[in-house]
Amino acid sequence: MKIIVPATSANLGAGFDSIGIAVNLYLTVEVLGESRDWKIDHDLGENIPTDERNLLLTTLSAVLEDKNVALSAKFHLKMTSEVPLARGLGSSSSVIIAGIELANQLAKLNLTSDEKLKLACEIEGHPDNVAPALLGNLVIASTVAGKTSHIVADFPSCALLAFVPDYELKTVESRKVLPNELTYKEAVAASSIANVLTASLLTNNLEVAGQMMEADRFHESYRASLIPELQLLREIGHEFGAYGTYLSGAGPTVMLLVPDDKLTLLTEKIMEKNLTGHLYPLKIDNKGLQVEESVF
């Protein structure tokens, strides 16, 4: 059995903690067979546990405990990932979704998508990454008082270009620079921008969507000092035809929405700056979680 989960890019500027997209980088978890102890083979670095301390297995345990179910065996697993760690592309969320599905398959829980999303939001705390990782495409979601409501929609046709810096930025560190509260006036302004962003995405108006992404009042202005590449890439985007540029998740990845016919030019112009990092031309993943050789 093989579980495949896409990377994600959250917030899209003003859609803080509620809007995300799935993109075509993947985490894969393969069940190799039963084992005396839980064991995970991976090449993700020595700081990533290979036993029950791994997020994959702590998630599995949380699901089994929630459902009051126990497994009769332990398993040898293989985990491979194209998703850069701690870069704002949902690496932890993809593992959480994989862990939920692993529990679903091994314990034959037959969970619905809504049940999986509820569990994921309880573990992660907000839906912006876990929802598109599970469902694919563009997802707009809200979790209030433990209840998650969501809409899945096709993302407007365009190219995506991600600049992934070589340095990590943990979400907890990126959240420390955010204010504890906004004034009522600030909240109304930020909300109105997010509303227009959402409407523009749902009506395929990328010009307006790009403007609203860059007008965010919730988080980007506070985090910009942590990601010096953001402003430079935004300026390059303005000069060479990008629809918009935003900080992916908590950063440090910067995402550009680009007309298909401008992708090559923008890639060349960014490469000319010799920034320390990698460029990834990406596409929307419209499938979300996939399971090969499912037990169901």
Curated annotation (Swiss-Prot):
Chain segments annotated as coiled-coil in the UniProt record: none
A GO biological process held by the record: threonine biosynthetic process
Species for this entry: Lactococcus lactis subsp. cremoris (strain MG1363)
Reaction catalysis annotation: L-homoserine + ATP = O-phospho-L-homoserine + ADP + H(+)
Keywords: Amino-acid biosynthesis, ATP-binding, Cytoplasm, Kinase, Nucleotide-binding, Threonine biosynthesis, Transferase
EC number: 2.7.1.39
Protein name (Swiss-Prot/TrEMBL): Homoserine kinase
Gene3D superfamilies according to UniProt: 3.30.230.10, GHMP kinase, C-terminal domain
Family according to the record: Belongs to the GHMP kinase family. Homoserine kinase subfamily.
Bilayer-spanning residue ranges: none
Binding site for ATP: P84, L85, A86, R87, G88, L89, G90, S91, S92, S93, S94
PANTHER family hit by this protein: HOMOSERINE KINASE, HOMOSERINE/4-DIPHOSPHOCYTIDYL-2-C-METHYL-D-ERYTHRITOL KINASE
Subcellular location: Cytoplasm
InterPro entries given in the database record: GHMP_kinase_C_dom, GHMP_kinase_C_sf, GHMP_kinase_N_dom, GHMP_knse_ATP-bd_CS, Homoserine_kinase, Ribosomal_Su5_D2-typ_SF, Ribsml_uS5_D2-typ_fold_subgr
Record SUPFAM superfamilies: GHMP Kinase, C-terminal domain, Ribosomal protein S5 domain 2-like
Phylogenetic classification of the source organism: Bacteria, Bacillati, Bacillota, Bacilli, Lactobacillales
One GO location term (cellular component): cytoplasm
Any GO molecular function: ATP binding
Top-level taxon of the source organism: Bacteria
Main location: cytoplasm
UniProt pathway annotation: Amino-acid biosynthesis; L-threonine biosynthesis; L-threonine from L-aspartate: step 4/5
